[in-house]
C-alpha cells in the first residue's frame, strides 16, 4: 500500500473533523475529540509502525491541535506538558501501544486466530533457570530484505514485545497491562 494514499485520506479526515469541532465549539470536550479525531488517528495505525517521523508528523500536528483545543492553550506553548496532562501518548507511542496491546491479547489467547498465527511464543527448552524464563518471549521471524518487510506486524511485534520488562508482559489483566504499558511509554520520552 502506498504510504501517501493512506496518509492523505487519514490525515484529511482527521483534519476535517478537527476543523468542524474548532469552528463550532471553542474549548470542546475531550469526549468529542476522542469520538471524531482520535478514531481517525488510531484507524489502522499499526500499519504505520516503523515509518520515519516525517511521515507521522502530519498526524502528530493534528493531535497537537486537538490537545490545544481542549485545553485552550496558545499555538506556541510547548505541547509535551499538554499531552501529558491529558494522558495522551504521542502518535509514534500510540502506534507502539496498539501493537503491544494486540500482542498481549495474542499471548493470552484473546485475539483472533489470524493474529495468533502471525507470532509464536518461544518454547522454554532449557532446564536451567534464566532471567528471561519468567517472561513470555516471542520468536523473531526470518529477517526480511526490505524495509517494508521489517515493518510487518510479524516482524515488529516480537521486537517491541521482547523489549518490554517482564512485569508488564506478565500483567494479570488487560486493564493492568494498559496502565503499566502507558506509564512505561510515558517514561521513555
Located regions from the model:
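Hydrophobic/basic alpha-helical segments
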Residues: 1-189
Amino acid at each position: 500500500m502506498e504510504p501517501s494514499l493512506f496518509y492523505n485520506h487519514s490525515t484529511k479526515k482527521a483534519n476535517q473533523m478537527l476543523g468542524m469541532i474548532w469552528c463550532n465549539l471553542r474549548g470542546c470536550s475531550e469526549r468529542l475529540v476522542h469520538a471524531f479525531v482520535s478514531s481517525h488517528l488510531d484507524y489502522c495505525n499499526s500499519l504505520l509502525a516503523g515509518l520515519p517521523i516525517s511521515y507521522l508528523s502530519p498526524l502528530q500536528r493534528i493531535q497537537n491541535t486537538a490537545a490545544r483545543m481542549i485545553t485552550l492553550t496558545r499555538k506556541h506553548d510547548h505541547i509535551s506538558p499538554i499531552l501529558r496532562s491529558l494522558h495522551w501518548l504521542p502518535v509514534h507511542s500510540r502506534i507502539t501501544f496498539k501493537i503491544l496491546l494486540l500482542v498481549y491479547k495474542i499471548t493470552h489467547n484473546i485475539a483472533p486466530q489470524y493474529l495468533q498465527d502471525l507470532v509464536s511464543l518461544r518454547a522454554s527448552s532449557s532446564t536451567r533457570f534464566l532471567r528471561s524464563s519468567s517472561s513470555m518471549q516471542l520468536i523473531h521471524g526470518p529477517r526480511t530484505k526490505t524495509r517494508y518487510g521489517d515493518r510487518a506486524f510479524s516482524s515488529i511485534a516480537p521486537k517491541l514485545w521482547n523489549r518490554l520488562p517482564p512485569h508488564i508482559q506478565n500483567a494479570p489483566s488487560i486493564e493492568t497491562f494498559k496502565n503499566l504499558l502507558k506509564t512505561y511509554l510515558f517514561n521513555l520520552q
